[in-house]
């Protein structure tokens, strides 16, 4: 639907510093606690990591990895909500999912079959950013044990991640009033137009 563009921020904003290129790739570093980054700092960090996420996810030809950035972003910027290993996360919704997902509804509803959510992830370890998996949820009509969601993921090297459906659904079932979906932090949520 829309190609996302994050605001470009100064490299030193919010305590973020970018080190000199190492091994022909820029190092995306965060000084201090990454939970303390302001919006400009998060944007600068995301912009530093952005191209390498897409390059990694698409290395092995994953179909969703090749197109998810053309979908609707669900937040103004990446954020660290806690799940998925304390990674920065940014979710994109395909055309089928976007209208319903962007309501951030709670209650008795179900996403339409064919909805796909792709969640980018960036880890920070020892002050340095690294690409995490691209987490994918696909709404189907034949997976009642998982609230009709099919869970998958693409590793940073583009290979399919081997995951157990129950590993994902056991956590997502905690969002039972949200059709097993986690939502971005409230302060970064976008809404449907």
Language model features: what each stretch is:
Residues 1-9:
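Bacterial N-terminal signal peptides that target proteins for export
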Residues 8-18:
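Hydrophobic helical h-region of N-terminal Sec-dependent signal peptides
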Residues 18-24:
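Sec/Tat signal peptide C-region and signal peptidase I cleavage site
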Residues 25-163, 181-193:
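Extracytoplasmic c-type cytochrome modules immediately beyond a signal peptide or single-pass transmembrane anchor
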Residues 164-176:
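The canonical Cys-X-X-Cys-His
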């Amino acid at each position: 639907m829309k190609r996302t563009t994050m605001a470009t921020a100064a490299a030193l904003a919010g305590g973020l510093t970018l080190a000199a290129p190492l091994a022909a790739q820029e190092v995306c570093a965060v000084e201090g606690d990454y939970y303390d980054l302001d919006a400009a700092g998060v944007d600068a960090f995301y912009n530093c990591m952005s191209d390498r996420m897409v390059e990694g996810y698409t290395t092995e030809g994953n179909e969703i990895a090749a197109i998810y950035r053309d979908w609707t972003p669900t937040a103004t910027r990446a954020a660290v909500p806690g799940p998925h290993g304390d990674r920065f996360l940014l979710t994109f919704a395909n055309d089928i999912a976007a209208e319903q997902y962007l309501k951030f509804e709670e209650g008795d509803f179900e996403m339409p079959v064919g909805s796909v959510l792709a969640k980018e992830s960036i880890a920070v370890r020892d002050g340095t950013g690294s690409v995490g998996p691209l987490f994918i949820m696909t709404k189907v009509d034949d997976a009642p044990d998982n609230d009709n969601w099919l869970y998958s993921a693409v590793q940073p090297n583009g290979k399919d991640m081997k995951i157990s459906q129950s590993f994902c659904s056991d956590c997502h079932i905690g969002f039972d009033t949200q059709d097993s979906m986690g939502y971005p932090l409230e302060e970064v949520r976008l809404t449907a137009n």
